[in-house]
């Protein structure tokens, strides 16, 4: 029970419907999104500034940009419909906004999978000074 409470606290204040996104990341990469990507580089986790540190961090940068383009619903609170088929995620439902959020999460999960080899522990919990340079545009 204590583990569930800690997980719930960790999920507070982080972007997106984390449970669905977490499941997508786990399905596509075999890794826990919370454990591996919640505080990585300049963009993985809450907020994002500066230059992406590597291809994995760029996945988070692109995900942030994707969320920034969504209009008509809140990516931070939305629950969408999706299914997993073999090694892919299929976004469903009739709501275009929710489907767009799902596609943002799907693309990030695939990006994490495709860039597993770029993950470098030196970018875990980087000092905030590392991410102070001006961000590139989406």
Curated annotation (Swiss-Prot):
According to its UniProt record, which residues of this chain constitute the active site?
63, 105
Residues bound to Ca(2+) are 43, 45, 47, 64
Do you know which InterPro entries this protein is assigned to?
PLipase_A2, PLipase_A2_Asp_AS, PLipase_A2_dom, PLipase_A2_dom_sf, PLipase_A2_His_AS
Q: List, separated by semicolons, the cofactors it needs.
A: Ca(2+)
First and last residue of the signal peptide: 1-16
Q: In which tissues is it expressed?
A: Expressed by the venom gland.
Keyword set, alphabetical order: Blood coagulation cascade inhibiting toxin, Calcium, Disulfide bond, Hemostasis impairing toxin, Hydrolase, Lipid degradation, Lipid metabolism, Metal-binding, Platelet aggregation inhibiting toxin, Secreted, Signal, Toxin
Q: Can you name a GO cellular component term?
A: extracellular region
One GO molecular function term? toxin activity
Annotated cofactor note: Binds 1 Ca(2+) ion.
The disulfide bonds in this chain are 42-131, 44-60, 59-111, 65-138, 66-104, 73-97, 91-102
Q: Which GO terms fall under biological process for this protein?
A: arachidonate secretion; lipid catabolic process; phospholipid metabolic process
Gene3D superfamilies the UniProt entry points to: Phospholipase A2 domain
Its recorded reaction(s) are: a 1,2-diacyl-sn-glycero-3-phosphocholine + H2O = a 1-acyl-sn-glycero-3-phosphocholine + a fatty acid + H(+)
Subunit (UniProt): Monomer.
The function of this protein is: Snake venom phospholipase A2 (PLA2) that impairs hemostasis. It weakly inhibits ADP-induced platelet aggregation when tested on platelet rich plasma from human and rabbit blood (15-25% of inhibition at 5-10 ug of enzyme), and dose-dependently inhibits blood coagulation, possibly by inhibiting thrombin activation. Exhibits high hydrolytic activities toward L-dipalmitoyl phosphatidylcholine. PLA2 catalyzes the calcium-dependent hydrolysis of the 2-acyl groups in 3-sn-phosphoglycerides.
The family annotation for this protein states: Belongs to the phospholipase A2 family. Group II subfamily. D49 sub-subfamily.
Its protein name is Acidic phospholipase A2 Tpu-E6a
Which organism is the protein's source? Craspedocephalus puniceus (Flat-nosed pitviper)
């Amino acid at each position: 029970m204590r583990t569930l409470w800690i997980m719930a606290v960790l999920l507070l204040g982080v972007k997106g419907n984390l449970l669905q996104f977490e499941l997508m990341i786990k399905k596509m990469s075999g890794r826990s999104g919370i454990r591996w990507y919640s505080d990585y580089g300049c963009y993985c986790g809450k907020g994002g500034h500066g230059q992406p540190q590597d291809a994995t961090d760029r996945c988070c940068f692109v995900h942030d940009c994707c969320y920034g383009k969504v209009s008509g619903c809140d990516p931070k609170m939305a629950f969408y419909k999706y299914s997993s088929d073999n090694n892919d995620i299929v976004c469903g439902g009739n709501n275009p906004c929710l489907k767009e959020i799902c596609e943002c999460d799907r693309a990030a999960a695939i990006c994490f999978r495709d860039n597993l080899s770029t993950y470098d522990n030196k970018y875990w919990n980087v000092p905030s000074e590392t991410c102070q340079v001006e961000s590139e545009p989406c």
